[in-house]
């Protein structure tokens, strides 16, 4: 599954493909190198397939779940919303974008922020977005529940996590 490099006619090396997949995943989820490596280490210690565990960990980040629920237009905006203390997890304020969500967690926008025009606009824009099956969302109340952690097959991110595992296991 080698692809042509845009800049020249040579095929990309195995390392180049692996590095590109890692950079793609880091960019999609907005994670820097050191935290990304820590997610890999944590995924490796978990039971099951390391690559799938890595994707589940990245998908379980609070900023990503806020994005998936449709409370933000982009993951970057979701990160800012969490950072600015607009989000409650199980009724408690959490302002750490990397906070890992568990099954059963209830995520909502703070009561004081719900009436802001910003969230009305966001819900209008993201209303047509498909919410993953592992999340229940009440868009009107800006509240959602994580039914279960996602399985790899329902994560629609175009990343080949096995290449990332190969890269880090060198």
Question: What are these regions, as identified by a protein language model?
Answer:
Residues 3, 7-69, 96-170:
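Ferredoxin-like alpha/beta domains used as RNA- or RNAP-binding modules
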Residues 68, 83, 89:
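Short glycine/serine/threonine-biased micro-segments
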Residues 69-75:
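A contiguous catalytic/ligand-binding core that recognizes phosphate-bearing ligands
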Residues 75, 81-82, 101:
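Short, well-ordered loop/turn sites that connect or cap secondary structure elements
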Residues 86-87, 92, 112:
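Short, surface-exposed secondary-structure boundary micro-motifs
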């Amino acid at each position: 599954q080698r692809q042509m490099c845009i800049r020249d006619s040579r095929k990309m090396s195995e390392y180049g493909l692996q590095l590109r997949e890692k950079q793609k995943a880091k960019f999609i989820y907005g994670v820097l190198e050191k935290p990304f490596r820590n997610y890999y280490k944590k995924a490796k210690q978990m039971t099951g397939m390391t690559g799938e565990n890595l994707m589940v960990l990245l998908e379980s980040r609070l900023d990503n779940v806020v994005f998936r629920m449709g409370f933000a237009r982009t993951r970057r905006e979701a990160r800012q919303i969490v950072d600015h203390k607009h989000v409650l997890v199980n009724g408690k304020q959490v302002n750490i974008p990397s906070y890992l969500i568990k099954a059963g967690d209830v995520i909502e926008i703070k009561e004081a922020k719900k009436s802001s025009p910003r969230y009305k606009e966001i819900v209008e824009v993201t209303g047509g977005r498909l919410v993953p099956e592992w999340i229940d969302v009440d868009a009107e109340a800006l509240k959602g529940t994580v039914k279960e952690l996602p399985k790899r097959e329902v994560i629609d991110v175009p990343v080949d996590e096995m290449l990332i595992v190969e890269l880090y296991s060198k």
